[in-house]
Regions:
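Exported/periplasmic cell-wall-interacting domains
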Residues: 165, 290-293, 302-305, 309-437
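A general beta-strand register signal
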Residues: 93, 190, 271, 321-323
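Structural recognition of the beta-strand scaffold that forms the well-ordered cores
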Residues: 170-171, 259-262, 268-270, 278-279, ...
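Residue-level structural signal for beta-strand termini and adjacent loop
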Residues: 105, 141, 282-283, 334
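Acidic, low-complexity Ser/Thr/Gly/Pro-rich repeat segments typical of extracellular/periplasmic
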Residues: 2-255, 405-406, 418, 430
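A structural motif detector for short, solvent-exposed N-terminal "entry" segments of globular domains
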Residues: 247-286
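Solvent-exposed, polar/charged alpha-helical surfaces in well-ordered, non-transmembrane soluble domains
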Residues: 171, 175, 218, 266, ...
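Short, surface-exposed linear segments at secondary-structure transitions and domain or protein termini
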Residues: 148, 209, 286-295, 341
Length: 437
């Protein structure tokens, strides 16, 4: 996991669209060259005094926070309005994160996209135009507040690393997040292939005061590149508690490697990119030490790993972990005679040495493992258990109660009811539950 902060000098000019017909009014009046003329020789005046017409007033521009403000709330962002005209240009100069924004319909207003940085100075310059062509430029300089308390955020995924098709984005927050909706709005996901997913809040959770997970509705498409940006600087995560950094990370999704095991059939199938590649005999947990049912993800792998328990202390080769409590797919050369026939392990999935080595070499963190047929159910948070929940239930974990549509251009929040029907096949998960492996 790593924390990444983005700093630097940014001066971002956000150009407005010129409205068609914005010069449709009459031409500006011109002032006369002189306000009088010399009298004729006869003393009669040939020219009367000409009165100067007033210059048309430009639109009234309002910038919030106002000029000279100190302690501005960064979570409110910047708002610009033009009364009696349209915005032509909004530029924001700051030494912090770049500021982008969007115009309203008709360019009557502009608002920054994300929260502002804490403890940062900003200068906003605005040009607006009236329908008669007159323009006005206004500038406001202000500084955001310095919070008494801040939160930090870490992402589990490593830069440029490859993960399995089940891997969620996992965020760890240093403080209890109560304003989860505001934080969720600040989380952006870009994907090289279209993905529908959702955020889920977990508190308390392993490793942190609060966790947030992004999981696709179905597994990630193999070969997807995922980029995450948390625009958290200036977001108020709890009363008086603000984020103070922007978090970014890019990682990849590798090939699809899915393991499905039945503790009653004593076999596991390995699917690679949707096709059955291996069907191996196994021995799972003996009665009293049953391997727990559930839809897990591989967490890590070790060769060997030291396993210690009642009556044993072993260095076990080719071990792939899928629960925090210590359940693995691993080489069990001592139980090859029982594999395929009887459950004799202390809870792990025993494999023959060659099979364990093959799976070890295939596995990366985030590869799905589904265990079925056991009398013992798995426990939420004993591993990366985000796939324990069906999609309809997982959606309820979103603070916004919305799904996310992600693609190359970023992500948007959408009403789940408007999404296309989920047509993904699910035989890989139902097989284990029905003990048909």
């Amino acid at each position: 996991m790593k924390r990444i902060g983005l700093t630097g000098v940014a001066a971002v000019a956000v150009l407005g669209m010129a409205l068609a017909g914005c010069t449709s009014g009459g031409p500006l009046a011109t002032l006369p060259a002189a306000n009088g003329a010399s009298a004729s020789a006869s003393g009669t005046g040939a020219a009367a005094s000409a009165s100067a017409k007033p210059t048309p007033a430009g639109p009234a521009v309002t910038i919030t926070p106002g000029n000279g403000s100190r302690g501005a709330d960064p979570s409110k962002g910047i708002t610009v309005t033009a009364s009696g005209g349209t915005l032509k240009n909004v530029s924001v100069h700051t030494a912090g994160d770049p500021v982008t924004g969007t115009y309203s319909a008709g360019n009557a207003s502009w608002h920054s996209t994300w929260a502002l940085d804490v403890s940062q100075s900003y200068t906003v310059t605005v040009t607006a135009a009236a329908s008669n062509g007159s323009t006005v430029t206004k500038t406001a300089a202000f500084r955001t507040l310095t919070p008494a308390s801040t939160f930090t955020t870490e992402i589990l995924e490593g830069s440029g690393q490859s993960y399995g098709v089940g891997m969620p984005i996992i965020l760890y927050f240093s403080q209890r997040i109560t304003n989860r909706a505001a934080v969720e709005r600040a989380l952006q996901v870009s994907t090289s292939k279209p993905v529908i997913g959702s955020w889920y809040w977990d508190y308390p959770c392993n490793m942190a005061a609060t966790c947030a997970y992004f999981r696709p509705r179905d597994y990630w498409p193999a070969g997807t590149t995922v980029s995450f940006t948390g625009h958290l600087n200036g977001v108020e995560g709890a009363p008086g508690v603000y984020g103070h950094h922007t978090l970014t990370q890019t990682f990849g999704i590798g090939q699809s490697v899915i393991a499905v095991a039945s503790t009653q059939a004593h076999r596991t199938k390995i699917y690679i990119n949707g096709k059955l590649a291996y069907n191996w005999p196994i021995s799972s947990g003996k009665p009293g030490d049953d391997t727990p049912d559930g839809s897990y993800l591989t967490i890590e792998k070790e060769n060997p790993v030291r396993m210690v328990g009642p009556g044993y202390d072993l260095l076990v080769p080719w071990s792939v972990r899928f629960t925090f409590s210590g359940d693995y797919y691993h080489d069990a050369y001592w139980s090859t005679g029982e594999q395929g026939f009887e459950n004799v392990s202390h809870g792990c999935v025993n494999l023959a040495p060659a099979d364990a080595e093959t799976y070890y070499n295939l596995a990366v963190p985030g590869d799905p493992i589904t265990i079925g047929g056991s009398p013992r159910g798995g426990a939420w948070d004993n591993g990366w258990t985000m796939w324990f929940l069906p999609w309809s239930q997982y959606l309820k974990g979103s603070a916004l109660h919305e799904a996310v549509e992600a693609g190359p251009g970023g992500s948007t929040f959408v009403d789940p009811a408007t999404l296309p029907r989920d047509t993904a096949k699910a035989p890989l998960q139902t097989a284990a539950a029905n003990n048909s492996v």
